[in-house]
UniProtKB/Swiss-Prot annotation:
Source species: Acanthamoeba polyphaga mimivirus
EC code(s) of this entry: 3.2.2.-
Keyword Hydrolase: yes
Protein name: Putative ADP-ribosyl glycohydrolase L444
Biased composition (Polar residues): 24-33
Record keywords, A-Z: Hydrolase
Pfam families: ADP_ribosyl_GH
Domain of life: Viruses
Family of this protein: Belongs to the ADP-ribosylglycohydrolase family.
PANTHER family for the chain: ADP-RIBOSYLGLYCOHYDROLASE, ADP-RIBOSYLHYDROLASE ARH1
Signal peptide: none
Coiled-coil residue windows: none
GO MF entry, a single one: hydrolase activity
Amino acid sequence: MSDKIQSRESKTTKPTKTEKISDKSGNLSQVKSSKNLSKSQSIYLEIDSLSKKFLEEGRQYIYKWIRDEYGLSKNEATALDISIYNTTIARMINIYKFDETLAAFLPFKFGKEIISPRQDFYGFATTCGTILYYQSFGDTLGYYNGNWEFNYGNDNRPDYVNDLISEFIHLGGINDISMVNWLASDDTILYLITARVVLEYFFQGDNAEISYFGTRLRQEYLKAKPLIQNRHPGQTTMDSLDIMSNIEWDKLPYNSRAIGAGAAMRSGSIGIFYPGRQNRKKLVALAVECSRITHNSATAILGSVTSALFTAFSLEKISVNLWPHYLLEILRSNIIDEYIEQSRPNEYSLFSRDKVIFQGQWEKYVSSRFSGVNPRDLRYMHNPVERYRYLTENFSKGCDMPGGCGDDCVIMAYDSLLQSNGVLEKVVVYSILHPGDSDTVGSVALSWFGAYYSTKKNLDILSPRFDELEYSNEINNLIWNTEDFVLGLTKVFYKFIYIDIATDLVEQSMKLK
């Protein structure tokens, strides 16, 4: 797997003079620095230069949008831009605080003198990096070497939840469980491969063709087939890869029966690199194609979009209560439909027909679980057995295993996050300790949990488990031991996150006038 998680091989040489390289295509610029600098110092100089570049691009985007959207004069737009800039920076510092006790999770072991001037960025980068650990933890625990995913061959009766909780406690519970020699399932392997391809695509620049992404996904998924075949992959995944070996990346036929969660489990990393409203269409396109490689159905595609979208919502710090409401807004809009119709017009009528099932599931969920935008306090949902019964009886009909479909998987994962209220043990119990597709629901829920609730307390509990993960070294190599991940996040933070926050502030400001 290590060959699949390595960084781009092409790195810049480092002449003695420090210089900034501009790139009008939207690719990441790089700063070339002295050979005498340590790796940490060299990366810091690159981050410093890139942060200024992308912050300026973000400001220019907002300034132009102000002029175009509101018809302000140059002087009015300039004055508003200055005000919005100062408020946005203050808000970014406040939202993405960095706790110095988390320094062990930083890339390249940066010292305090490097962290201090950009604590908000390093707080954001730390959160993004740990998402991959949380995902693999959820998968590995839920898989339990194939035991819990298939419940030792037992049936899916709700009261079996209590047996799993008892076994989890016997294994040590959240504080003392040991996962040494526990295997990851196909979920971790495909999630990491997808993250690496997303990062490659991100470095191609703003105008990169979607075909690059699809071609690389096809290549890497096919390479991974021998790795995943003994880790209980979904039958649809394996059958589709067999077909994909003989066709192009975008030629898998639409299949209304391919409704599994195989895409939802691996697409979350798209949301790490494409948060913000200005990136919604890009996120949708990537998530759709991520699914179509193996699961070309409306249910699977929309599960993939939801997984990526909720990761983005996490990093945008949108209240968890609002996620399903915003999801329904997007489902009712034309964003997804337009891409489906434009990219594969011959399949649009089938997609449109099946889309109502996925949308209906979420409408039913919101209607029963929410009063307005606030979740209802339903006492039976505090009981793990009754909670599982409610979710499976209402949202898992037609699935071979509860949590194994593209729609019920993300509903179960989201409800686990909602019900947890930031408590690690709760999200583990609700998302993993049930007789359904525990590794997939667990991996999706824990990845969102890590993006939204990656606190010192939770990291103190889980960091020993992170070291025990089968793919711990591969995760570490992807996010910290190469420059690409952290340098890519400079654009995400200083351009995409800046634009997203600034847009909200501008809209609020203009409403007051």
